[in-house]
């Protein structure tokens, strides 16, 4: 019996159960479902902005945007020697974006996309999928603006899937699967907005708000 076709709705049900899809490589047509024993998360009050990053944000001439070019952000995340984003996964996230359940935050230098992050939203949970950086600190800037936005929008869970040394240096932690599922259940019981009404994120305010909570 053939497995059911992978659709955006099926993907959302998987996220609600705490599992997410990955491919072995760009050319691997198979989709593997992952439920790690230990899960990486970003405590929304624990993002660490170093002095150098704070200076970078305050003085930056980059522009931060949201959902201006979701597909290009995913493509940039996949544009590396090894990637888990195959054509099927790319298509699914673009379809989730059209449904309002996937968003991108972009960092631009002029009109050039130099950094960004994208993920899936469900209830009060944000599932970070991937990020990229074509300039020094561009992905860190994207994360700082993303976390500020998630807090303002009422999110309670930022799932990073795995914990990397880079994420750990910025304040991400690792928790057990059982703890993660409990937090996920609680996050799914409410609603949040990725585009909260009246929200404004100028660089100085982002640094100040992150400094007050970290």
Curated annotation (Swiss-Prot):
Catalytic activity line of the entry: N-terminal L-lysyl-[protein] + L-leucyl-tRNA(Leu) = N-terminal L-leucyl-L-lysyl-[protein] + tRNA(Leu) + H(+); N-terminal L-arginyl-[protein] + L-leucyl-tRNA(Leu) = N-terminal L-leucyl-L-arginyl-[protein] + tRNA(Leu) + H(+); L-phenylalanyl-tRNA(Phe) + an N-terminal L-alpha-aminoacyl-[protein] = an N-terminal L-phenylalanyl-L-alpha-aminoacyl-[protein] + tRNA(Phe)
Keyword flag Cytoplasm: yes
Cystine bridges: none
Single GO biological process annotation from the record: protein catabolic process
Cellular component terms per the entry's GO annotation: cytoplasm
Localization per record: Cytoplasm
Catalytic EC class: transferase
UniProtKB keywords: Acyltransferase, Cytoplasm, Transferase
EC assignment: 2.3.2.6
GO molecular-function terms, A-Z: leucyl-tRNA--protein transferase activity
Family that this chain belongs to: Belongs to the L/F-transferase family.
Role played: Functions in the N-end rule pathway of protein degradation where it conjugates Leu, Phe and, less efficiently, Met from aminoacyl-tRNAs to the N-termini of proteins containing an N-terminal arginine or lysine.
The protein's name: Leucyl/phenylalanyl-tRNA--protein transferase
Gene name linked to the record: aat
